Amino acid sequence: MKYIELAQLYQKLEKTTMKLIKTRLVADFLKRVPEDHLDFIPYLILGDVFPEWDERELGVGEKLLIKAVSMATGVDPKEIENSVKDTGDLGESIALAIKRRKQKSFFSQPLTIKRVYQTLVKIAETTGEGSQEKKMKYLANLFMDAEPLEAKYLARTVLGTMRTGVAEGLLRDAIALAFHVKVELVERAYMLTSDFGFVAKIAKAEGNEGLEKVTIQLGKPIKPMLAQQAANIKEALLEMGGEAEFEIKYDGARVQVHKDGEKVIIYSRRLENVTRAIPEIVEAIKEAIEPEKVIVEGELVAIGEEGRPLPFQYVLRRFRRKHNIEEMMKKIPLELNLFDVLYVDGKSFVDTKFIERRKKLEEIVKPNGKIKVAENLITKNAEEAEKFYKRALEMGHEGLMAKRLDAVYEPGNRGKKWLKIKPTMENLDLVIIGAEWGEGRRAHLFGSFILGAYDPETGEFLEVGKVGSGFTDDDLVEFTKMLKPLIVKEEGKRVVIQPKIVIEVTYQEIQKSPKYRSGFALRFPRYVALRDDKGPEDADTIERIAQLYELQERIKGKV
């Protein structure tokens, strides 16, 4: 299958904002895809190369990409860089450079999707001495044979800046439409495997019957079940039917552990492989968990000198560390508090009641210094739960989780079967979708940032406010440096930013607002932290903001 066909799809997707049209375009394309291409083409359509849980990265920045194009075309790198000032898009500028190419090689052949994909895999797997030079040559070979339109979208794929408006929800619907299968079965299969390529192949080859049989696969992370927030203990008990399991809500980073004999893989909430960053937890898991094949979930907490929990940002520092890991192990010791089990020796526990999963977890885990089972209380008594809540807060934890005893595990769902109970309203994780230049001595820096909430159905990020407080001067320097390469266009003092960076904000309240398409605005938002453990699709959604607004109004009504 020729790459120009995929490039033409990207072009059509970029030209329409209509979700139904985009879905039909992707579905029609998928129908024509050969079966042996289906395991990777869904990722290329999303603008990626690999699933989010795959460790491989291309490791190609703008400068290396421009050098590769220069090698392929003979156009000076500075000319390509200067062109971006006019086009506002490196992909467009590279397409122009390809048009200026003197001539194609005598041995030139049309690009195929398979060749492009295999070359990108080769680039990701090229490491060590001289790797940058090799990557540049691999890319140059592709650009030598590329048409301008192909070059534009190949460049965007390499940089991860596709911008065609195709998100997970749209791809899910397109797979269902293309292969005449139920959308809820595509959704379920994807939530269990986090692998659109695998799901698309099953949908085409085996239809609804095949999708119904899809189950957990060791080594492929399951989308985590999420919780809403309750106003208080009484509301949580009422929602749970009068009795619930309460467990400590730790201020850490959620992880999913896959153990297959001596092999252990640990995924973050974002489903990134963080195994190498936390070797002591890997070893502790091998000692603490007896069965050979297991998937468990827990909260990874950083522990301070007096044994009290440190803020979750300390865990993120451990995740980010690539070198001197042993030194970081001493500086920031970790503890894993397990709270769920999803798979044991060939049996899935996803459709098992929570109370039975909890018992199984306690059966298979032998706590040690690094691995514990989350402390819990099963009760019908609100006063007893209040005492447990108070003790959790005194110990330095965030609050409690309330879990319905008969609840099955619902991958990717944020329902009311799990509820958070915290003393404050939940902070929000939002995406920076724009920025405004500062004034005076800060005129060369961004001074405030436009916040967007995610709409998973359309893949859009809808504005919910602007944040300018909570940043230090150093923060503004860092954010300006981080966001400048992501500028899509400038409109006076305001710039439109490609949605890539997630930040955590606090706020005084959520208000309904006709000013924004989202329908909501944050009153007095304040920056708390950079959430580089989350991708834009992991940001809080419009639906989540609506839920928090309702919770806020309920709390007001009870004051």
Swiss-Prot record:
Annotated GO MF terms: ATP binding; DNA binding; DNA ligase (ATP) activity; metal ion binding
Record flagged with keyword Magnesium: yes
Keyword vocabulary terms for this entry: ATP-binding, Cell cycle, Cell division, DNA damage, DNA recombination, DNA repair, DNA replication, Ligase, Magnesium, Metal-binding, Nucleotide-binding
InterPro entries: ATP-dep_DNA_ligase, DNA_ligae_ATP-dep_bac/arc, DNA_ligase_ATP-dep, DNA_ligase_ATP-dep_C, DNA_ligase_ATP-dep_cent, DNA_ligase_ATP-dep_CS, DNA_ligase_ATP-dep_N, DNA_ligase_N_sf
Source taxon at top rank: Archaea
Cystine connections: none
Catalytic reaction equation(s): ATP + (deoxyribonucleotide)n-3'-hydroxyl + 5'-phospho-(deoxyribonucleotide)m = (deoxyribonucleotide)n+m + AMP + diphosphate
Cofactor(s) essential for the protein: Mg(2+)
Gene Ontology biological process terms from the UniProt entry: cell division; DNA biosynthetic process; DNA recombination; DNA repair; lagging strand elongation
SUPFAM superfamilies per the UniProt record, alphabetical: ATP-dependent DNA ligase DNA-binding domain, DNA ligase/mRNA capping enzyme, catalytic domain, Nucleic acid-binding proteins
Binding site for ATP: 247, 254, 269, 299, 339, 414, 420
Keyword Ribonucleoprotein: no
EC number of the protein: 6.5.1.1
Active site residues per record: 249 (n6-amp-lysine intermediate)
A Pfam short name: DNA_ligase_A_C
NCBIfam families: dnl1
Function of the molecule: DNA ligase that seals nicks in double-stranded DNA during DNA replication, DNA recombination and DNA repair.
Similarity-based family: Belongs to the ATP-dependent DNA ligase family.
Entry protein name: DNA ligase
Protein's organism: Pyrococcus horikoshii (strain ATCC 700860 / DSM 12428 / JCM 9974 / NBRC 100139 / OT-3)
Protein's gene: lig
